[in-house]
Structure formats: structure tokens, C-alpha cells
Amino acid sequence: MELTLHEARVIGCLLEKEITTPEQYPLSLNSLTLACNQKTSREPVLELSETQVQIAVDSLNRKRLISEQSGFGSRVVKYKHRFCNTEFSELQLSPAALAIVCLLLLRGPQTPGELRTRSNRLHEFKDVIEVEDCIRQLMNREKPFLKQLPREAGRRESRYVELFSASSSQLETAQPESASHTVAHVAVSLDAEPLELTKRVTELEQQVAELTQKLDELIASLS
């Protein structure tokens, strides 16, 4: 299973809304688009059109990860996921694992601490240790669902990423730029600014001197 960025967002939204707003689930295309474009609890924030969401939905339907549902007497088609925990799904996840996968689909790589803080509407973890235990279970499967990313400079915890989407495989495993390199780059930039300003001031002073000389010559010719 490999999801595009848009497909991962659609699945993540359906998983989330099934738990947090069950009275509104399944979702219409309009509701699903609004969920995909939320400004909060989404990373990155997207601005998908209904057409783009429909394309993702149609693709997921072909992959048998979404099903359509029409209410009696209503023409509005609504969508529900078949990603996990349904009679048609091979994938069965515990509530804790579902919460972690959902958050990673919606918000990208996160630390165990971030997952615990952000999961309260999906699942209540007692502590970070419980989150870490669940992460290990998801990583130790025959086909892992998560992987650990190299720890970034300045972070106490490593981040984890889901392995269902194509975007996760594009993440660089290399460490980010070293702090010394960053500081050096900033120092060069700061040094460059005064040099540019000094050059500009010198040019202006030269122009003023030339104008003053011409003015003096003009006054002399008139006297």
C-alpha cells in the first residue's frame, strides 16, 4: 500500500472524523474537503479543491480503501474508509495504534511526546511510555508500519514516520545541517550586509561631491 499525499490526507481525515465526530460520519465530498483543508491539526496545511479530493477518493476507491454510501432519499454521496478495522480490511489496529497512525498521516513525522499531546481526542495514553510501546509494536511487525528518523539537532526525542504513504519514503534520513554550519552561514550573511551598506554610502558620497562641484562651477559662472 502506497498512498499519495492527497490520499493520505483523505484517509487520515476519515479515520479522525469517524472517532471525533461519529454523528457526522461518513463524510460528504464537501465535508471531506473541509477536513482536508483544516488550518489546525494538519501538516502541511493544504488548499485542495473538491476536484482534487474527488480524484484522491476515486483512486482510493479503486484501491478498495474507501466505500461510497448514499442515504435513502438523498443524492449526496458520502464516503467511509476501508483502511482498517472493518470487515473488508486486512489491517486491524488497536485504538492506540489507530490514533498514532492517524496522527502521522495527518501531521507527518512526530515524537512520542507530540503524539501523546495531540492524541487526546483519538485515544487517551497514560504516558509517553505507553506511546513508545505502541510505536515499537507497529515497527516490529513483519511488515513495519512506522520507522524512526535520525534525531535532529536540539531535539531530545527522535521522530517517527508512517510507511503507508509515498511522502514518507522521500524523507531524507541524513542529519540536518550542523549548528556550526548554520552559524557560519548566518555570520557570513551578517558580514555581507555592512559591506554592501558601506559600498552604497561611498557611492552616494561621491555623487554628492560631484553635484557640489558642479553647483560651485555654476555659481562661479553666474557671478
From Swiss-Prot:
Pfam families: DUF480. Signal peptide: none annotated. Coiled coil: none annotated. It comes from the Bacteria. Belongs to the UPF0502 family. This is UPF0502 protein Sbal223_2520. It comes from Shewanella baltica (strain OS223). The lineage of its organism: Bacteria, Pseudomonadati, Pseudomonadota, Gammaproteobacteria, Alteromonadales.
